[in-house]
C-alpha cells in the first residue's frame, strides 16, 4: 500500500491532503501543490484531472518544492499509485505496429541512443512491470507511464512524437 501527502506551500507548509489510493481529481482538496511527502509506494502525478497532462514519477522521499520532482508548475490535479512487481520486461520497436528492429529490456536504460543507437521508439510492448519512458537521456524531460500492454504508436502512450531518451523500471527502492 502507498501513502502520499500533498502540501499547498513549500517545505511541507500550508493546507495538506493525504491519500493512499488513486485520485482522478485532486482539485477539491488543494488549489496548488508546492511540496510532497511520499511515505510509501511509487506514484505518478499528473498536472491535469483524469490522469492527463505532464506526468511526474515520485518514489518514497521528501520533495520540498516542485522543482525537486522536475515540475514545471505547482499544478498537480490527479495521481495514481503504481503497482509493484518483481520482474520487468519490455520490447522496443523502431517502427509502428511492432515492426522493424526489436530490442528487449529488463533493466533501467539511462540512454537509449547509447545502448541501441536509436533516438526514437515507434512502438512498445510492456510484457512485465510498469516503466517510465523519458524523452531525454538520464531520466530527464517529459515522462510517460507504461503499464503492461501493447503500444502500437507513440500516441498510445500519450506522446506527440517518438522521441525517446531513457527508460526506468518503476520500483519502490525501500
Swiss-Prot record:
What region holds the Beta/gamma crystallin 'Greek key' domain? Answer: 2-40, 41-83, 88-128, 129-171
Impact after mutating residue 5 to P = In CTRCT2; reduces protein-protein interactions in vivo
Q: Which domain of life is it from?
A: Eukaryota
Keyword list, A-Z: Cataract, Disease variant, Eye lens protein, Methylation, Repeat
MF terms per GO, please? structural constituent of eye lens
Q: What job does the chain carry out?
A: Crystallins are the dominant structural components of the vertebrate eye lens.
Q: Domain annotation text?
A: Has a two-domain beta-structure, folded into four very similar Greek key motifs.
The UniProt entry, under InterPro entries, shows: Beta/Gamma-Crystallin, Beta/gamma_crystallin, G_crystallin-like
In the record, the effect of residue 168 to W is given as: In CTRCT2; uncertain significance
Give the protein's recorded name: Gamma-crystallin C
Q: Which disease is it linked to?
A: Cataract 2, multiple types: An opacification of the crystalline lens of the eye that frequently results in visual impairment or blindness. Opacities vary in morphology, are often confined to a portion of the lens, and may be static or progressive. CTRCT2 includes Coppock-like cataract, among others. Coppock-like cataract is a congenital pulverulent disk-like opacity involving the embryonic nucleus with many tiny white dots in the lamellar portion of the lens. It is usually bilateral and dominantly inherited.
What does the subunit comment say?
A: Monomer.
Q: Which residues form the signal peptide?
A: none
GO terms classed as biological process: lens development in camera-type eye; visual perception
In UniProt terms, what is the effect of altering residue 78 to F?
Answer: In CTRCT2; uncertain significance
Listed GO cellular component terms? cytoplasm; nucleus
Q: Which family does it belong to?
A: Belongs to the beta/gamma-crystallin family.
What gene does this protein come from? CRYGC
Region of interest called Connecting peptide, as start-end residue ranges on this chain: 84-87
Record-listed S-methylcysteine modification sites: 23
* Originating species: Homo sapiens (Human)
Amino acid at each position: 500500500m502507498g501513502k502520499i501527502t500533498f502540501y499547498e506551500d513549500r517545505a511541507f507548509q500550508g493546507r495538506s491532503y493525504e491519500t493512499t489510493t488513486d485520485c482522478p481529481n485532486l482539485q477539491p482538496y488543494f488549489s496548488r501543490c508546492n511540496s510532497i511527502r511520499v511515505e510509501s509506494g511509487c506514484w505518478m502525478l499528473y498536472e491535469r484531472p483524469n490522469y492527463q497532462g505532464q506526468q511526474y514519477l515520485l518514489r518514497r522521499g521528501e520533495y520540498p518544492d516542485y522543482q525537486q520532482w522536475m515540475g514545471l508548475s505547482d499544478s498537480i490535479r490527479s495521481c495514481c499509485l503504481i503497482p509493484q512487481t518483481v520482474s520487468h520486461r519490455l520490447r522496443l520497436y523502431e517502427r509502428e505496429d511492432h515492426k522493424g528492429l526489436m530490442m528487449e529490456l529488463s533493466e533501467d536504460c539511462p540512454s537509449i541512443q547509447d545502448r541501441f543507437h536509436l533516438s526514437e521508439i515507434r512502438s512498445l510492448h510492456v510484457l512485465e512491470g510498469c516503466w517510465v519512458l523519458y524523452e531525454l537521456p538520464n531520466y530527464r524531460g517529459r515522462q510517460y507511464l507504461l503499464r503492461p500492454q501493447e503500444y502500437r504508436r507513440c500516441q498510445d502512450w500519450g506522446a506527440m512524437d517518438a522521441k525517446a531518451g531513457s527508460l526506468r523500471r518503476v520500483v519502490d527502492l525501500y
